[in-house]
Swiss-Prot record:
It holds the Pfam family YabA. Its cofactor is Zn(2+). Involved in control of chromosome replication initiation. Inhibits the cooperative binding of DnaA to the oriC region, thus negatively regulating initiation of chromosome replication. Inhibits the ability of DnaA-ATP to form a helix on DNA; does not disassemble preformed DnaA-DNA helices. Decreases the residence time of DnaA on the chromosome at its binding sites (oriC, replication forks and promoter-binding sites). Tethers DnaA to the replication machinery via the DNA polymerase beta sliding clamp subunit (dnaN). The lineage of its organism: Bacteria, Bacillati, Bacillota, Bacilli, Bacillales. Belongs to the YabA family. It is found in: Cytoplasm, Nucleoid. Residues 57-77 are annotated as: Disordered. It comes from Bacillus licheniformis (strain ATCC 14580 / DSM 13 / JCM 2505 / CCUG 7422 / NBRC 12200 / NCIMB 9375 / NCTC 10341 / NRRL NRS-1264 / Gibson 46). GO terms for biological process: DNA replication. This is Replication initiation control protein YabA. GO terms for cellular component: nucleoid. InterPro entries: YabA (IPR010377). Coiled coil: none annotated. Keywords: Cytoplasm, DNA replication, DNA replication inhibitor, Metal-binding, Zinc. Homotetramer. Interacts with both DnaA and DnaN, acting as a bridge between these two proteins.
Amino acid sequence: MDKKELFDTVISLEEQIGSLYRQLGDLKQHIGEMIEENNHLQLENEHLRKRLEETDQRLKSVKSDEKEIKAEKTGHADIGEGHDNLARLYQEGFHICNIHYGSVRKEGDCLFCLSFLNKK
């Protein structure tokens, strides 16, 4: 190998090293941008998870409140005015059971009527 070929080889290697150095710089910059974006996304995820938990808690409390209200309404409807009317009819001496409904009680208490009144 003569001096000119050696010199050309060194120049070629120098150009390749320069190109690799530029690529390495670009790669470092890209990695830095990705790290920055990753940190931003992690913070955003934490914020969104907190909001999701808060929303879930609010939703659960609203649902439990609705269940309580519904239970109160159905409780009052089940043992409400209709039940009171049947109890009044029974006290006035009428059957309220499905067997003798509406007929006059002649022999004291009816077990069927009493079991119906005691249902809740």
